[in-house]
């Protein structure tokens, strides 16, 4: 047993007592605050992807760099790479086409339409957990094969763009005509922390398809991109996989035709790898030893590569021309009878029992094998609805080619937002409904026009609360994950947003603003809605004794109803918006966690979120006009009263019922109820990180700073979808 005497004795001999043990003394080691308090509010999610982690610096302009790219020279190099087989990872049939298609597919396929997160837009396949998912075995090799090309072209092409372009070139080099390619995906430099991949603690934990409809998850098992290719929970039953397939592809916004096209198209080229038992496969890249240099899954089976490669454990080749585009997938699917069998690794798959050996071996030209299929491939034949589509594609290969080209383009561009963000020479001209298209601008308001419109709005009779509320309702639908939503398009005036419960009060201002727009004919309704917020904030600041100019950039347009996919826009309806003290459901997370979620979608920092909530409360912008969180006697005045009164120890807070969603703030001396609040209000006094920010804004010298910070954050939200201003 060590005593204080031991410490003194060690010091006397010239040895530091704290350097004697075997403890990990590196930064970040030891028990963390999250270990002690696992339910701690994730304020850190608002600090992701800062310039401190970006080696290119905040002045780097990817669009500018891309304009210097020899685009077709890059495609030529990618085409050459496809057939330059490397001994450390030999190419099947001398082509990496199937590998690169899978890399692009698995990068894009993490997208979930329910919350807009995931997808290929930031090159996340380079980082954990995706770089080490069980479904991404061997894609580390695909990325490493691309390194010489990335090294050559440097920052003129992002990893995120290169992954998808490599998949496109692989298809084109195999004889397929793609729909096009839009660049513009900017790399980030650390893993996304905000994506909820699920609660499971073990890889490949099975999820019931019904559970996928209740959570923002895109796969039926933890660590898969879509579904288990052996059927749900390794059932081996093609029909049982239909519900899972629909759920997962539906979560990406794909219908049955797109689903069939994507599965069949993705399985027209290449193969799966299951030469031997998966027990021979080593740790994934994140767990691999340092000398592996970021590669993982080293195999001890035979040579570990080429004919001995193990990836999924399945050993399937679908078509007799696995490096050339064809309709053989459907021809084989319906021509032969299929019997269940197992791969050399023991995985469940199907073989065409009555077929001749027509499938070429990937490394020995003298060998042939029978066609094989995944359990989930046969779902396309035996599910009645999928079968109808599959037979149509069987009989009309051109229809299949067109459907796959469009579905592949949608898959690989779904998280990029509107077409205005696409760059490069191969951007398709056609507007697609899932891109949330917008018309061309028809207004170009002058400075005088804007001044006149501001006067008209100010004289309209709308209160500060109404002006601020309508602008927030329009702009706050933006999602940073897939760049959907926002004020541009004025879709607040269209279905479904006009009928959302959260917008019930806000849309009451629309008829007034629509009248101003029609009478002036000088600006779009979208611009006038945002300008209403400008007027409201400036009036509120003036009432607080400050003359503030709120920046305004015209140029928004008004979308039409036929340019608005109602079903897809329903996904933007918030289940909670803590900025407006709105919550529709109590069975999803905590109110304060949902506030963080909303702020993260709006790309806000913790100080920006704090300033906005405090300002929205004193401006009376609650969705239902309630007084929850309105800690002021001067509603409509842009003051720091919210913070001053929240942190005032004269008041003590008690929940109004067992749900602990609403609270009363009582005077400690008189017992009088002074204020009411939600969890989205009290979190700024409860959470230590947010309280630290709130204390800044509550200080006696902070009023002007608070107003300026509120205005800056407000303008940021109003312009989140103004990609034309970048």
Curated annotation (Swiss-Prot):
Its EC number is 1.11.1.21. It is an enzyme of class 1 (oxidoreductase). One of its GO terms (molecular function) is heme binding. There is a cross-link at residues 226-252 (Tryptophyl-tyrosyl-methioninium (Tyr-Met) (with W-105)). It catalyses: H2O2 + AH2 = A + 2 H2O; 2 H2O2 = O2 + 2 H2O. Heme b binds at residue 267. The record marks 102 as: Transition state stabilizer. Pfam families: peroxidase (PF00141). Binds 1 heme b (iron(II)-protoporphyrin IX) group per dimer. This is Catalase-peroxidase. It comes from Escherichia coli O139:H28 (strain E24377A / ETEC). The lineage of its organism: Bacteria, Pseudomonadati, Pseudomonadota, Gammaproteobacteria, Enterobacterales. The gene is katG.
């Amino acid at each position: 047993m060590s005593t204080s005497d031991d410490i003194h004795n060690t010091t006397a001999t010239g040895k530091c007592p704290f350097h004697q043990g075997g403890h990990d003394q590196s930064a970040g080691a030891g028990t963390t605050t999250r270990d002690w308090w696992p339910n701690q509010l994730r304020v850190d999610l608002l600090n992701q992807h800062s310039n401190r982690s970006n080696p290119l610096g905040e002045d780097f302009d990817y669009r500018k760099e891309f304009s210097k790219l020899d685009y077709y020279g890059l495609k030529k190099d990618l085409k050459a790479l496809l057939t330059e087989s490397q001994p450390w990872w030999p190419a099947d049939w001398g082509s990496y086409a199937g590998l690169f298609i899978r890399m692009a597919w698995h990068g894009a396929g993490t997208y979930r339409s329910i919350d807009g997160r995931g997808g290929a837009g930031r090159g996340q396949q380079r980082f954990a957990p995706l770089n080490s998912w069980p479904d991404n075995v061997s894609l580390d090799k695909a990325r490493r094969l691309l390194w010489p090309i990335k090294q050559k072209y440097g920052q003129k092409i992002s990893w995120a763009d290169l992954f998808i372009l490599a998949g496109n070139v692989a298809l084109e080099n195999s004889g397929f005509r793609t729909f096009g390619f839009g660049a513009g995906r900017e790399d980030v430099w650390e893993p996304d922390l905000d994506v909820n991949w699920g609660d499971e603690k073990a890889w490949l934990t099975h999820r019931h398809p019904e559970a996928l409809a209740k959570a923002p998850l895109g796969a039926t098992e933890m660590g898969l991109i879509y579904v288990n290719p052996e059927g749900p929970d390794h059932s081996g039953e093609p029909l049982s996989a239909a519900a899972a397939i629909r759920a997962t592809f539906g979560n990406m916004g794909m219908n049955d035709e797109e689903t069939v096209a994507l599965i069949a198209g993705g399985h027209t080229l290449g193969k799966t790898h299951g030469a031997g038992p998966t027990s021979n496969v080593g740790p994934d890249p994140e767990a691999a030893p340092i000398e592996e240099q970021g590669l993982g899954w080293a195999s001890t089976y035979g040579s570990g590569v080429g004919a001995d490669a193990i990836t999924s454990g399945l050993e399937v080749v679908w078509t007799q021309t696995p490096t050339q585009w064809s309709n053989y997938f459907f021809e084989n699917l319906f021509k032969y009878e299929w019997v269940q069998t197992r791969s050399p690794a023991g995985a469940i798959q199907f073989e065409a029992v009555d077929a001749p050996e027509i499938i070429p071996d990937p490394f020995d030209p003298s060998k042939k094998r029978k066609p094989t299929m995944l359990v989930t491939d046969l779902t396309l034949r035996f599910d009645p609805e999928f079968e109808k589509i599959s037979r149509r594609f069987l009989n009309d290969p051109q229809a299949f080619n067109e459907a796959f080209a469009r579905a592949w383009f949608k898959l690989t561009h779904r998280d990029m937002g509107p077409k205005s963000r696409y760059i490069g020479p191969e951007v398709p001209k056609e507007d697609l409904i899932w891109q949330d298209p917008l018309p061309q601008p028809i207004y170009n308001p002058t400075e005088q026009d804007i001044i006149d419109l501001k006067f008209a709005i100010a004289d309209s009779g709308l209160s500060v609360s109404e002006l601020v509320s309508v602008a927030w309702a329009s702009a706050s639908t933006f999602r940073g994950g897939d760049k959907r939503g926002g004020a541009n398009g004025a879709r607040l005036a269209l279905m479904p947003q006009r009928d959302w419960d959260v917008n019930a009060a806000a849309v009451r201002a629309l008829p007034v603003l629509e009248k101003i727009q029609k009478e002036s004919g000088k600006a779009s309704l979208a611009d006038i809605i945002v300008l209403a917020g400008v007027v409201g904030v400036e009036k509120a600041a003036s009432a607080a004794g400050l003359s503030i100019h709120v920046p305004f950039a015209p140029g928004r347009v008004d979308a039409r109803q036929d340019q608005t996919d109602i079903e897809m826009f329903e996904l933007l309806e918030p289940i909670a918006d803590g900025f407006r003290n709105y919550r529709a459901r109590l069975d999803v997370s905590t109110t304060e966690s949902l506030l963080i979620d909303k702020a993260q979608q709006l790309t806000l920092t913790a100080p920006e979120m704090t300033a906005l909530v405090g300002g929205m409360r004193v401006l009376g912008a609650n969705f239902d006009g309630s007084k929850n969180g309105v800690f002021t006697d001067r509603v409509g005045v842009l003051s720091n009263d919210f913070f001053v009164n929240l942190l005032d120890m004269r008041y003590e807070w008690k929940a109004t019922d067992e749900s602990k969603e609403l609270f009363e703030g009582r005077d400690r001396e008189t017992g009088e109820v002074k204020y009411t609040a939600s969890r989205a209000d009290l979190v700024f006094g409860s959470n230590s990180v947010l309280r630290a920010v709130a204390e800044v804004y509550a200080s006696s010298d902070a009023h002007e700073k608070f107003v300026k910070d509120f205005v800056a954050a407000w303008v940021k939200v109003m312009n989140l979808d103004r990609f034309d201003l970048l």
